[in-house]
């Protein structure tokens, strides 16, 4: 399993639109679902900072994710540009293979 964690700072008033686009039936998931190695995404909202969101994307392998980016580069960039207006910033926090799960 390969995961990518993104952090977003959403503009006030854009929360609903952001959640729709980045949620389980949103445009990003629809794009990712074109690849058989995509396993799903989670959208998380920071309760301490309600304008901060995180997405976790799950892929079978890193090479599958990289291959997807190469094959769908223009569609990916087009989506990214079309939803820039919803956020102040976005950044990739980490990517990698989880060593183990920790349950608290």
Regions inferred by a protein language model and the residue ranges of each:
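Short, well-ordered beta-strand segments in beta-rich or mixed alpha/beta enzyme
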Residues: 2-9, 40-71
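Short acidic/polar alpha-helix capping motifs at helix-coil junctions
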Residues: 4-8, 17-18, 93
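Short coil/turn residues that cap or connect secondary-structure elements
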Residues: 10, 14, 30-33
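Short, conserved charged micro-motifs
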Residues: 13-19, 64-67
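An amphipathic, aromatic/His-enriched active-site/gating alpha helix that lines ligand/cofactor pockets
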Residues: 23-40, 58-93
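A general secondary-structure junction signal
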Residues: 45, 92-97
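Short, low-order "capping/linker" segments at domain edges
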Residues: 96-104
């Amino acid at each position: 399993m390969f995961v990518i964690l993104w952090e977003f700072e959403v503009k006030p008033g854009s929360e609903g639109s952001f959640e729709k686009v980045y949620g389980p039936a949103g445009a990003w998931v629809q794009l990712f679902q074109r690849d058989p190695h995509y396993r799903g995404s989670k959208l998380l909202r920071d309760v301490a900072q309600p304008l901060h969101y995180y997405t976790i994307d799950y892929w079978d392998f890193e090479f599958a994710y990289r291959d997807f980016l190469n094959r769908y580069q223009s569609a990916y960039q087009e989506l990214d540009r079309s939803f820039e207006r919803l956020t102040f910033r976005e950044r990739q926090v980490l990517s990698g293979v989880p060593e183990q799960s920790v349950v608290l």
